[in-house]
Design a protein with these regions (language model features):
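N-terminal nucleotide-binding beta1-loop-alpha1 segment
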Residues: 13-17
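Short acidic, Gly/Ser-rich segments with clustered Asp/Glu that frequently serve as metal-coordination loops
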Residues: 18-24
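Active-site-adjacent betaalpha module
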Residues: 1-11, 47-56, 79-200
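A short alpha/beta connector and helix-capping loop motif
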Residues: 8, 26-53, 58-65
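Flexible, glycine-rich phosphate/dinucleotide-binding loops
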Residues: 21, 69, 170
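Early exported N-terminus immediately downstream of N-terminal targeting peptides
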Residues: 59-60, 64-83
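Short glycine/proline- and charge-enriched loop/turn segments
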Residues: 27-34, 77-85
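Short aromatic-enriched loop/helix-cap "lid" or pocket-rim segments at secondary-structure transitions
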Residues: 26, 72-76, 176
Length: 200
């Protein structure tokens, strides 16, 4: 294990590990996040973290991306262009279900967000506060999008951020590498799944 100390009560936050984004085939398969999650062992690593947190009675929290029927889209950018063309991630559909490998158990909370910030209007902040959480272990997809946004949102709220680099990914491996190596270390601890479990 590396030399660091876990501060306060931790929670595991799993971002956007849902059917439409991660399963193959799926409506958003072309983004590559699901392929990367399977090929790089990210799903298995998150499974290990889930088992470790549950086994110690620690919170496991999920965030799911959903697209409101009446949403608006910004004018510029590939994400918005693609979103305008797809009817995907509607509440109550297969798209927004957590992948079966990481399915929540009764009592575990799911928060629904749109588009990127898992805190904006979701109640996640209030829930973490109610549990006395001080440290968040951040996992999921995609490193350069919602996981990255979640990291900054956690930092802005002064949570102690831990990112297991092998428990998140991005369809663009260069983006993942850059964020993990050059951005996250400024606002949190970047380590491995095994190391996190060893410190629980």
């Amino acid at each position: 294990m590396s030399d660091w100390t876990l501060v306060g009560k931790p929670a595991l936050l799993i971002v956007h590990m849902q059917n439409a984004i991660v399963k193959t085939p799926s409506p958003l398969e072309m983004m590559g996040h699901g392929r990367a999650a399977h090929e790089e062992g990210v799903i298995a690593n998150i499974q290990d973290l889930v088992a470790a947190f549950r086994g110690r009675g620690l919170p496991v929290v999920y965030c799911v991306a959903h697209t409101p029927v009446d949403t608006k889209f910004a004018a510029y950018g590939g994400f918005w262009e693609g979103s305008r063309q797809l009817e995907v991630n509607r509440l109550g559909t297969w798209d927004v279900e957590i992948i079966e490998e990481l399915a929540p158990v009764p009592g575990e909370k799911i928060f629904y967000n749109w588009p990127f910030n898992v805190f904006e209007g979701t109640g996640l902040q209030e829930y973490l506060q109610s549990l006395g959480v001080e440290t968040v272990v951040l996992t999921g997809v995609a490193t350069g999008m919602s996981v990255g946004t979640a990291a900054w949102a956690l930092a802005e709220r002064f949570y102690n951020l831990i990112v297991p680099s092998d428990a998140s990914t991005d369809g663009n491996s260069e983006v993942h590498k850059t964020v993990i190596e050059s951005i996250f270390p400024a606002i949190g601890l970047v380590t491995t799944t095994e190391d996190v479990i060893g410190h629980l």
